[in-house]
């Protein structure tokens, strides 16, 4: 099974989680921990290991969460979704390759997360094909 930490404001959770599930959860093996702020994210990252961290937050709170994820779980792949395209450059400087704007398509979301799934499969030598 695959475990993702999803840090997002409450009103986004349903929509974003359903997108993740429709793209990646063919076999019901995707576990998503919902975290609603950077403090909860920090607690979760100290407590558990994840295959990926997805941050979907508006404005500077997303930046704070991204910085925290990089500090606490530097090896864990990170996807940052933001309503502010100006953060793309900051993401680049933080070496976060997967930065998505709020209006990203399912294809863009898939492309951002697919390498994570692939990386996990190679390490766990699972049979999942992408």
Describe the residue ranges of each PLM region.
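Extreme N-terminal starter segment of soluble prokaryotic enzymes
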Residues: 1-4
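CheY-like receiver
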Residues: 51-121
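Two-component/phosphorelay signaling modules centered on CheY-like receiver
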Residues: 6-35
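Short, Lys/Arg-enriched segments at the junction into DNA-binding effector domains
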Residues: 120-130
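Structural motif
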Residues: 6-11, 36-38, 54-59, 82-83
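Short acidic-hydrophobic, aromatic-tinged amphipathic segments that line or gate anion-handling sites
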Residues: 33-37, 99-101
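Acidic, metal-coordinating helix/loop segments flanking the phosphotransfer/catalytic sites
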Residues: 35-51
């Amino acid at each position: 099974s695959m475990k993702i930490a999803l840090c997002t404001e409450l009103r986004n959770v349903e929509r974003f989680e359903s997108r993740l599930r429709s793209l990646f959860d063919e076999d019901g093996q995707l576990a998503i921990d919902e975290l609603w702020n950077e403090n909860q994210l920090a607690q979760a990252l100290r407590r558990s290991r994840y295959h990926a961290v997805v941050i979907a937050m508006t404005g500077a709170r997303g930046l704070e969460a991204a910085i925290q994820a990089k500090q606490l779980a530097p090896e864990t792949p990170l996807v940052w979704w933001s309503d502010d395209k100006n953060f793309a450059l900051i993401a680049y400087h933080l070496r976060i390759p997967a930065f998505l704007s709020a209006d990203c398509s399912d294809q863009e979301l898939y492309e951002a997360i697919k390498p994570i799934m692939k990386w996990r499969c190679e390490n766990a030598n699972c049979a999942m094909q992408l």
